[in-house]
Amino acid sequence: MEHTYQYAWIIPFLPFPVTISIGLGLLLVPTATKNLRRIWAFFSVLLLSIAMVFSADLAIQQINGSFIYQYSWSWTINNTFSLEFGYLIDPLTSIMLILITTVGIMVLIYSDNYMSHDQGYLRFFAYMSFFNTSMLGLVTSSNLIQIYIFWELVGMCSYLLIGFWFTRPTAANACQKAFVTNRVGDFGLLLGILGLYWITGSFEFRDLFEILKNLIHNNEVNSLFAALCASLLFVGAVAKSAQFPLHVWLPDAMEGPTPISALIHAATMVAAGIFLVARLLPLFTVIPYIMNFISLIGIITVLLGATLALAQRDIKRSLAYSTMSQLGYIMLAPGIGSYRAALFHLITHAYSKALLFLGSGSIIHSMEPIVGYSPEKSQNMILMGGLRRYVPITKTTFFLGTLSLCGMPPLACFWSKDEILNDTWLYSPIFAIIAWSTAGLTAFYMFRVYLLTFDGHLQVHFQNFSSTKNSSFYSISIWGKEVPKPLNVNLFLSTMNTNEKMSFFSKNTYQIDRNGKNRIRYFSTQFGNKYTSMYPHESDNTMLFPMLVLVLFTLFIGFIGIPFDQGVIDLDILSKWLTPSINLLHSNSGDSFDWYEFVTNAIYSVTISFLGIFLAYIFYGSVYSSFQNLDLINSFVRIDSKRILSDRIINGIYNWSYNRGYIDVFYGKVLSNTIRGLAELIHFFDRRVIDGITNGVGVVSFFVGEGIKSVGGGRISSYIFLYAFSVSICLIIYYFFRF
């Protein structure tokens, strides 16, 4: 067993040869390297698969024996300071290794087909392999310095991949935004690491935890300074895991290729912040108020992410805000002392969200031949609808991923999310109310995405997205005010002012008659695509296979954490995998499982989720058109004052959600403009004052020299006379002031 642990250091470096080989190949033999580009995809998958096998072996040993192994190499700087580099294998490490490798393999297989048309295919796989190496190195690090090194490498890879299509201004701006926002967190993390080293004199986790615990217990350290250092460490996790208020980079990160979105949101970048909190949890628990701070940030992020997802039209941005909200749940759990639930939800959410992002990539892939390759069109849910008949496999996988994220049993996220929701009652009723309410919002906005994408009819044929004002085609609206005059049911298509506000819940569907189909066929031929079919098509098997594998994970991964132990079979593998002493809320974890409490809480959570799904079906499903035909909705709002009030509330919610809570506007107008103004002021002072003084001295010296040169005339007698005259003047002044 120990023999396997001794070679665990190889795991992070297994994907790295692909990056080196592609880089050297493109530099030395670019033509041959490009001709064999599919071979590099094969080697990427192969090497990461070997890493997965090693990781699975370590995980099995961890489950059976809970053996913790650490090995370090010392690098002595001088007699008083040395750095140690090594690796640590414990339950947390083995969980993250399995998560990164399994999701990474699925994303690499998917990317082979998804990126096959792209000129940057090889560059993409080089970045991806380096991304996996960086994340694997991060989770196996044995000290804070090593974590910081790989932390920066993860940030660099995310910057390269978010801005992969750097010729697009939006992608270039997005990667810069992600980089700058994470600079704030990384700077906080560095300050926190240095502060803790100043207190404890060690970067090693075990030594650091033990020394700090003793210092705080004996009141030998300033508790405020220790809390500040811990808060700075947490700031790094806040930025990396897109927690409030450093979440603004996450939706813009969707400018990168969809496989990268899946990897970032499931197993790499956003998981790095959660991993850091989990790794440093023994430190946070001994410092007052830090746990409260972590839980507060988590619950704010839970609610904020859910509300911002309500009005998004881009399918990937909707999923991004969903990730933000779910990461809030995961961050909330360790803050309230539920360490096990946090890692459980990290696992289940990773597979479900990877499935959803790969599904969205399949949807985008099917829409691009029809609407073009611009993300504003191919990712716009307004132009979708009715895709269930064109992409049935993608629809089924996306549906299962949506149900899982909504917390529907027996799918994966139901078990982990319910555990967090139940634990919030033990911590704070206010936090519990917010967390449970957000569970309903999650079901609402996730089924909003599903219904806008797959329900009804293909809306692209009804849309005017060519920016022409004189189009006679109706633009389907999602949010805003209804057109006040009644719809003429005899017209197949009606006009609408393009400047009109979007409607809040409207998703109009129409019966397509024979004339309508003819008009659709005529309209669709105007795009001039090379594809003969003007309807979406299912993705290739290479893209569908990873999605089907992730469906299996979504169906069955939740069973590893079910706390059922009836003496015959113990399904709770996760509890044996993790260290139970860290779970602060359940010190009596060995007690028998309470079936009644579990079923009661499950009924409540599922009911709330069903309510959100029901509301989504009413406002976005095909049934909404029936309500419109029966005029049931208008019967509830016939009183003008009530309708005006409801419209104001609805538009207020829409403006809040669509404008991202005005947080980006605040950062842009207050922080960015203030910093830019300060920079311009400093630039003016440097150029006019500092440079002015320097240049002024030079100019004055020049003119003085020229004047002296003209007076001297080149004769030695003149120089002697001026020298004697100057000395005489100085002596007279000295004599005068002395007496």
Curated annotation (Swiss-Prot):
One of its GO terms (molecular function) is NADH dehydrogenase (ubiquinone) activity. NDH shuttles electrons from NAD(P)H:plastoquinone, via FMN and iron-sulfur (Fe-S) centers, to quinones in the photosynthetic chain and possibly in a chloroplast respiratory chain. The immediate electron acceptor for the enzyme in this species is believed to be plastoquinone. Couples the redox reaction to proton translocation, and thus conserves the redox energy in a proton gradient. Keywords: Chloroplast, Membrane, NAD, NADP, Plastid, Plastoquinone, Quinone, Thylakoid, Translocase, Transmembrane, Transmembrane helix, Transport. Its main location: plastid. One of its GO terms (biological process) is electron transport coupled proton transport. The chain crosses the membrane at residues 9-29, 39-59, 89-109, 125-145, 147-167, 185-205, 224-244, 258-278, 280-300, 327-347, 354-374, 396-416, 425-445, 544-564, 603-623, 716-736. NDH is composed of at least 16 different subunits, 5 of which are encoded in the nucleus. It comes from the Eukaryota. Belongs to the complex I subunit 5 family. Its EC number is 7.1.1.-. It catalyses: a plastoquinone + NADH + (n+1) H(+)(in) = a plastoquinol + NAD(+) + n H(+)(out); a plastoquinone + NADPH + (n+1) H(+)(in) = a plastoquinol + NADP(+) + n H(+)(out). It is a multi-pass membrane protein. Signal peptide: none annotated. GO terms for cellular component: chloroplast thylakoid membrane. It is found in: Plastid, Chloroplast thylakoid membrane. This is NAD(P)H-quinone oxidoreductase subunit 5, chloroplastic.
